[in-house]
Structure formats: C-alpha cells, structure tokens
Amino acid sequence: MVLSAEEKALVVGLCGKISGHCDALGGEALDRLFASFGQTRTYFSHFDLSPGSADVKRHGGKVLSAIGEAAKHIDSMDQALSKLSDLHAYNLRVDPGNFQLLSHCIQAVLAAHFPADFTPQCQAAWDKFLAAVSAVLTSKYR
C-alpha cells in the first residue's frame, strides 16, 4: 500500500504527538479492544486485563511504540517490522483479523485525544497506514 507524501506527513506528524504518551494511549486502545471484542482477550490470559491495568498500559505502549517505528521507516516497514512479524506469525499466532480490530480502536483513541489533528484526511491516512502495518505483520502467516 503506497501512501502519498501528504498521507505520510499526517501519520508522522501525529506520531510525534503520540510518542510521549504511548503507554496511556496504547493502553486505552487495548481497553477498547478487550471491551468491544472479547475474543481478543484469549491472547492475554497472563495479563491483568482490568481497565487501566499496568499490564495493559505496558503492552499498549509496546504496540504504539512499534507503530511509531513503522512510521519512522514508513518506506521500509517490511524490514523495520520483520522481527515483530515473525513473533506474531510463528510464536503468538495471533488471528490476523484482530489487527484490523485493534486498528479501529487505535483510531478511536486518536480521534478522542487529538480531535483538531485527526481530521478526515488524517483518519484516512491512518487507516491506510495501519492497514499497511497489519499487512506486514500478517505477511509471514503463509
């Protein structure tokens, strides 16, 4: 999936605002995921899944940090996310459909926290970007 220069700028620009708040925002996205799509909890049976828990915030921070890395290497995401792709495909065996569910939750959190920045154009860019990240993470499932 090719993002235009404008779309890349929108993604990278918002990533700059997210970077200092990865745990809180990522945790909120996971809280939304677990509340809305209960089947996703099965991958985290070893976590305290109560809303706002340290486990959820810590993992949410890892998720948003990885997304930040993908944004930094937006033209070479395959290489930047290769180890993460291996982990999800070979070890964790996460259902690929869950990435799309999480993408929606991430966008809801971004819209709630950055309403002035998360314009329709920005949302479209983020939707496209997160679909590309999901495609990379599921590319080794075959």
Swiss-Prot record:
Residues 2-142 form the Globin domain. PROSITE patterns: GLOBIN. O2 binds at H59. This is Hemoglobin larval subunit alpha. Red blood cells. Belongs to the globin family. Signal peptide: none annotated. Heme b binds at H88. One of its GO terms (cellular component) is hemoglobin complex. The keyword Transport applies. It comes from Pleurodeles waltl (Iberian ribbed newt). Involved in oxygen transport from the lung to the various peripheral tissues. The keyword Transport applies. Heterotetramer of two alpha chains and two beta chains. GO terms for biological process: hydrogen peroxide catabolic process.
